[in-house]
Amino acid sequence: MITAEMVKELREKTGAGMMDCKKALEDAGGDMDKAIELLRERGLAKAAKKASRVAAEGIVESYIHGNGRIGVLVEINCETDFVARNEEFRQFAKDIAMQIAAANPKYVSREEVPLDVIEKEKTILRQQALNEGKPENVVDRIVEGRLEKFFEEVCLLEQPWIKNPDMKIKDLLTEKIAKIGENIVIRRFARFERGEGIEKAASC
């Protein structure tokens, strides 16, 4: 039997509507973990529909790390000013700024990586595989696998979240879209590191 307390607990854990929580619990036979999974699956579908909506509101979040050693600015957009003031949205923006400071991505998504950069990386990875003595017929598969690791390093959305490495940033974003109920877009960011690109004068 599904109780009101179970529905309330599931709602608190997921942010989903009461009726959605009740239906998920019924479909899961009262299993809380399974109900959460069902809501996430259904939430992902909702998030995909919301992704086509225009997100022109939002905030520019800043984060300074390590006694002024690293600074980040990130613009995150949503659909309404109401959500831009929402505490959960603002915390999400802080988490993303901290992620950028810690993981040093170069691009928001893999779609932003220039084709010439991808081709250059493929050439390097192919040569590495050949130098390791890998058979020619499996080199392309090895290159594709290592290219995925490259995207995980340089693309913010592909990176494992520093607070929960089992989840990628794109999964966190999708979860927030489903929970908050609006399209959310990580538009752009800038990361500064003290002394970056400056050659220190050699001491005499």
UniProtKB/Swiss-Prot annotation:
InterPro entries: EF-Ts_dimer_sf, Transl_elong_EFTs/EF1B, Transl_elong_EFTs/EF1B_dimer, Transl_elong_Ts_CS, UBA-like_sf. It is found in: Cytoplasm. The keyword Cytoplasm applies. The keyword Protein biosynthesis applies. Gene3D superfamilies: 1.10.286.20, DNA helicase RuvA subunit, C-terminal domain, Elongation factor Ts, dimerisation domain. It comes from the Bacteria. Coiled coil: none annotated. One of its GO terms (molecular function) is translation elongation factor activity. Keywords: Cytoplasm, Elongation factor, Protein biosynthesis. Residues 80-83 are annotated as: Involved in Mg(2+) ion dislocation from EF-Tu. One of its GO terms (cellular component) is cytoplasm. Associates with the EF-Tu.GDP complex and induces the exchange of GDP to GTP. It remains bound to the aminoacyl-tRNA.EF-Tu.GTP complex up to the GTP hydrolysis stage on the ribosome. PANTHER family: ELONGATION FACTOR TS, ELONGATION FACTOR TS, MITOCHONDRIAL. Belongs to the EF-Ts family. This is Elongation factor Ts. It comes from Caldicellulosiruptor bescii (strain ATCC BAA-1888 / DSM 6725 / KCTC 15123 / Z-1320). The gene is tsf.
